[in-house]
Regions:
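Terminal accessory/targeting
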Residues: 1-42, 46-67, 76-77, 86-88, ...
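Catalytic beta/alpha-barrel core
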Residues: 71-73
Length: 276
């Protein structure tokens, strides 16, 4: 069986279910509805929105709920697909990149953010958002909230501020996995999908990303490694898993295209990480 196929994704979900994990959306977690052990499935729909409908259908068949974050670009923002995913019982949110789109102009960015939020609220009462990494841009989209407050726009949660933050990780021992770079240990290719806050552990300053890596990413490279890790660690209480659905397909041609494109992107991202 090849990695990053829908069949493999189904096996990953099955391992989580067999491990006794409760599946909830990020919105539900923000509302205080989590019961441990739990996993939040987060999907960043960067491209190929149709692939997200495929994963959403598999999840619905298995009685699993997930959260899908859509960009405003045409490759992601496809109303019929968004509506179908909502009908399947999943949460959707805005995968915002406004600060990058407006080259750091915060007033223009927040105006654009507000308009796009209104757009997505046609399909779902969007209450959570998540930044798009925009790896080529020099602007971090999260910096918009240095000037503004997303709570003023009816938003109750943003994963990097409210879930994947140092204090929450320290208290709740949260683990974080992402398929960035088309692997589960792709930190060296990761520009922004990481945890940067600092923790004090045994009087030493370490990054919370280092903590999650030491706890989870040892020997976890492929999805099959991930499944084995889940089967070997039944005591995990809190976990967020981020996937990019465009990477997951049973179509051989699309699978090969994604494999080649990701190889090229990884080389470029590795250069960006070194420069920054």
């Amino acid at each position: 069986m090849k990695d990053f196929t829908l069949s493999t994704y189904r096996q990953l979900l099955l391992a989580l279910k067999n491990g006794g994990c409760n599946f909830l959306t990020f919105e539900e977690w923000c509302d205080g509805k989590a019961t441990v052990p739990f996993v939040i499935l987060r999907h960043d729909v960067d491209l190929k929105a149709g692939h997200s409908l495929a994963t959403a259908r598999i999840e619905a068949e298995m009685g699993v709920k997930a959260t899908y974050y859509f960009r405003i670009v045409p490759q992601s923002n496809q109303p019929e697909i968004i509506e179908s995913i909502v009908r399947l019982g999943h949460e959707i949110g805005y995968h915002y990149e406004d600060l990058s789109l407006f080259n750091g102009d915060s007033p223009k960015a927040i105006d654009h953010f507000d308009k796009q939020l209104t757009h997505f609220r046609q399909f779902y009462s969007v209450r959570t958002i998540c930044m798009h990494g925009s790896p080529i841009s020099k602007f971090d989209n999260r910096d918009l909230w240095k000037t503004y407050n997303y709570h003023d726009y009816g938003i109750i949660g943003e994963p990097y501020f409210d879930f994947l933050n140092a204090e929450n990780i320290k208290i709740n021992q949260i683990l974080y996995f992402t398929d960035t770079a088309r692997m589960w240990d792709g930190d060296k290719y990761n520009v922004r999908d990481k945890i940067n806050q600092q923790l004090t552990v045994n009087s030493e300053q370490v990054s919370s990303q280092q903590l999650t890596n030491s706890a989870t990413h040892q020997d976890v490279h492929s999805t099959f490694d991930f499944i084995n890790w889940i089967n070997s660690n039944p005591s995990v209480n809190c976990m967020m898993i981020t996937t990019h659905p465009q990477r997951w397909t049973d179509n051989r041609i699309e699978w090969l295209q994604e494999f080649i494109m990701q190889f090229v992107k990884n080389k470029l991202k590795q250069l960006l990480v070194r420069i920054r």
